[in-house]
């Protein structure tokens, strides 16, 4: 009666890497020769061993103990600091980092493969290196040569960690309202004053220094988001080692991810350094935010995978009632619950979302590689356009479905799923934050429909639908999947029609975009997973593991027959328009 032990799903990961997405051909085309098949295999094997043996055993205990706060000092749960030291010593922190600053220079996709295993084994622990990688990407993209030399080496080595400090008590989504101020100093630095809340890994004992990336406004800044600048504010000064004027005021007591320190940070004239251009800080921060949003989307997959592993074991062991078609285990008091159709429904839903979301993660990861490594400018731009389109979908669709998966995992356990000792409720609690932070899923949906799709006059959407159309044309006469290909092709066409419909309505009433956004995003996500499930099913037919292939084909069929029909409900909601949402006056919601 303990939390399920995580086992990295290496067979499925290898299937995607080798059979579906051809990572090796992908790396060769990009000139990433260091990412050899042997290197990829070693990262999978050794990464799995570290996550299974070091991180997974700390997941339950970390949740039970949580972080400790004492007069501004935060201590992580027992074993966390030692695990981070092992992680750093093993070179894992710099797998995809720039070799110029001590990294291994492997493609971003391999970093995400590793991140999945970390997040599945221990979501809270994974927050500490995850936020650091985001800070590294922002400094690498926008920092001066001196800033890169000062900070990236230590961050890459894991000697220092990083944060991003956006939210204040009065503003989360609307960053234009921030009150934190940065006053220029004679030496070219800035005195940063203000308070930030909900800062993940804002204070802890796992690294010698913490490098905060802080949004603040200059004294003469324009109003709103056009007046936001970004500053590097170290906990300890990089040159002298003296403590900077930034301190943790408290840590939050949360529903989940309890072993991740969520801090209130007070900046009292702390010495900071402008990164990027003045008043262009949001552009710099979005480099970090996009990295974080992909990582957050993956948290839906990670908690879902851990929940699924617990649920399938329990469903095979738990004996309750007899099968409706006759006893399946007549020598036992009852049949295992996995024989019951409703338990199968839940398990297959979990499996379909997990494996579909993993495919979406790997598909997106390859685009990251192309955007960073391709020598072809047009190819890089195409990849960046697809990334812009897919990022809000990855973040929102994967976290919403991941939450559904963890709820199913609890339900498979029945009453035991609600009891702490089994560990299933922790996974649901840990998963619940993912649709909220790094931009709520409602905001992701608004970004997708309003900015990415309609804002590009449909260009970004067409970039993806062309891929699907080409795939459908190539497989229209597939002997086994012809009907599913036709279903996907029809939805792919309707996707554009629905988009035009919303765009026309929005010209008359902008509320139409906000009213349609969430359902539009979910509609989009289901179509994208349908495309990926067909790719997996076709690839599985040639797989040498017959039982694995059968499971893929059966899950694809389940997805098309049981989950993809949800698109009809989402489309109907989009077409219903805004009036039924907005006609009721705000006063009518009063108690």
Q: Which residues make up each language-model segment?
A:
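Glycine-rich cofactor-pocket loops
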Residues: 31-34, 64-76, 284-291, 295, ...
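Amphipathic, small/basic residue-rich leader segments at the start of a protein or domain
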Residues: 1-126, 150, 579-591
């Amino acid at each position: 009666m303990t939390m399920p032990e995580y086992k990295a799903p290496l067979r499925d990961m290898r299937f995607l890497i080798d059979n579906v997405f051809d990572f090796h051909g992908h790396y060769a085309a990009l000139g990433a020769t260091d990412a050899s098949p042997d290197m990829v295999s070693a990262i999978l094997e050794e990464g799995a061993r570290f996550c299974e043996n070091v991180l997974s055993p700390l997941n339950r205990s970390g949740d039970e103990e949580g972080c400790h706060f004492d007069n501004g000092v935060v201590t992580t749960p027992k074993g966390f600091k030692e695990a981070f030291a092992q992680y750093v010593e093993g070179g894992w922190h710099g797998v995809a980092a720039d070799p110029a600053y001590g990294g291994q220079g492997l493609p971003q996709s391999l970093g995400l493969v590793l991140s999945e295993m970390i997040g599945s084994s221990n979501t809270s622990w994974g927050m500490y290196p995850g936020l650091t990688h985001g800070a590294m990407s922002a400094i690498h993209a926008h920092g001066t040569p001196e800033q890169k030399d000062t900070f990236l080496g230590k961050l890459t080595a894991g000697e220092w960690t990083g944060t991003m400090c956006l939210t204040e008590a009065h503003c989360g989504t609307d960053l234009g309202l921030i009150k934190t101020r940065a006053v220029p100093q004679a030496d070219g630095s800035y005195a940063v004053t203000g308070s930030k809340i909900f800062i993940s890994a804002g204070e802890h004992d796992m690294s010698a220094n913490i490098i905060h990336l802080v949004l603040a406004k200059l004294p003469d800044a324009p109003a709103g988001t056009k007046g936001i600048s970004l500053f590097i504010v170290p906990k300890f000064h990089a040159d002298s080692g003296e403590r900077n004027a930034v301190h943790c005021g408290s840590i939050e007591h949360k529903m989940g991810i309890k072993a991740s320190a969520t801090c209130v940070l007070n900046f009292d004239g702390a010495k900071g350094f402008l990164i990027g251009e003045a008043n262009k800080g949001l552009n710099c921060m979005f480099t970090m935010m996009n990295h974080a949003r992909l990582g957050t989307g993956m948290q839906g997959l990670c908690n879902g995978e851990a929940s699924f592993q617990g649920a399938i074991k329990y469903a095979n062991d738990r004996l309750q009632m007899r099968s409706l078609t006759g006893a399946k285990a007549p020598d036992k008091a009852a049949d295992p619950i996995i024989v019951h159709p409703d338990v199968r429904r839940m398990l297959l839903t979990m499996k379909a979302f997990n494996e579909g979301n993993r495919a979406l993660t790997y598909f997106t990861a390859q685009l990251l590689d192309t955007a960073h490594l391709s020598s072809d400018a047009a190819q890089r731009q195409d990849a960046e356009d697809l990334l812009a389109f897919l990022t809000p979908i990855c973040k929102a669709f994967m976290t919403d479905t991941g939450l559904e998966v963890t709820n199913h995992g609890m339900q498979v356990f029945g009453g035991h799923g609600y009891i702490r000792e089994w560990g299933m409720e922790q996974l649901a609690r840990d998963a619940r934050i993912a649709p909220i932070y790094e931009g709520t899923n409602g905001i992701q949906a608004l970004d997708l429909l309003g900015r990415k799709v309609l804002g590009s006059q449909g260009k970004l959407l067409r970039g993806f639908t062309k891929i699907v159309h080409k795939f459908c044309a190539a497989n229209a006469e597939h002997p086994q999947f012809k009907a599913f290909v036709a279903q996907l092709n029809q939805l792919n066409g309707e996707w554009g029609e629905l988009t035009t419909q919303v765009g026309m309505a929005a010209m008359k009433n902008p509320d139409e975009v906000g009213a349609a956004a969430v359902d539009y995003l979910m509609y989009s996500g289901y179509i994208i997973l349908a495309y990926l499930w067909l790719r997996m099913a076709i690839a599985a037919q040639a797989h040498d593991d017959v039982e694995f292939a059968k499971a893929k084909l059966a899950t694809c069929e389940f997805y098309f027959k049981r989950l993809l029909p949800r698109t009809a409900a989402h489309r109907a909601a989009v077409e219903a328009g805004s009036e039924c949402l907005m006609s009721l006056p705000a006063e009518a919601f009063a108690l």
